[in-house]
């Protein structure tokens, strides 16, 4: 798509979170606590995508993300792309990926799991990154996709 045809305005410096599934867009926005951010934010949903049919996009001026924030995005929408923008140009493109191990980000759904009864961090292994299937290191309960509850 040419720049003059863009539905969502370009930003000078910042980050573009692209290829968000439309059903996950507002969950990603909530997760990143965008309502508390005092930066210029542009959100577009159900935009045309050649590869996915439709997509969501979030553009945030003058913002970078910590690795933990990226891990959280990957748990909700594992195939999101991040574009780093400087002076209106994309200087870096990055695919967000689910990490091999997730510590302190996800709640175990097993009420008998020690992490729900003792003051300790949860720890999960990713057993299928594409389906985002996790297994608790302590009780071995498996959970996937929309059943993942972030802390």
Curated annotation (Swiss-Prot):
Q: Which GO terms describe its biological process?
A: 'de novo' pyrimidine nucleobase biosynthetic process; pyrimidine nucleotide biosynthetic process
Cofactor annotation: Zn(2+)
A molecular function GO annotation: metal ion binding
From what superkingdom does this record's organism come? Bacteria
Presence of keyword Zinc: yes
Sites binding Zn(2+) sit at 108, 113, 136, 139
How many cofactors are bound and how? Binds 1 zinc ion per subunit.
Q: Which GO terms describe its cellular component?
A: aspartate carbamoyltransferase complex
Q: Which InterPro entries is this protein grouped with?
A: Asp_carbamoyltransf_reg_N, Asp_carbamoylTrfase_reg, Asp_carbamoyltrfase_reg_C, Asp_carbatrfase_reg_C_sf, Asp_carbatrfase_reg_N_sf
Record flagged with keyword Oxidoreductase? no
Residue stretches in coiled coil:
none
Q: Which UniProt keywords are listed? A: Metal-binding, Pyrimidine biosynthesis, Zinc
- Please give the function described in this protein's UniProt entry: Involved in allosteric regulation of aspartate carbamoyltransferase.
Its family remark reads: Belongs to the PyrI family.
HAMAP family in the record = Asp_carb_tr_reg (MF_00002)
Its quaternary organisation is: Contains catalytic and regulatory chains.
- Protein name (Swiss-Prot/TrEMBL): Aspartate carbamoyltransferase regulatory chain
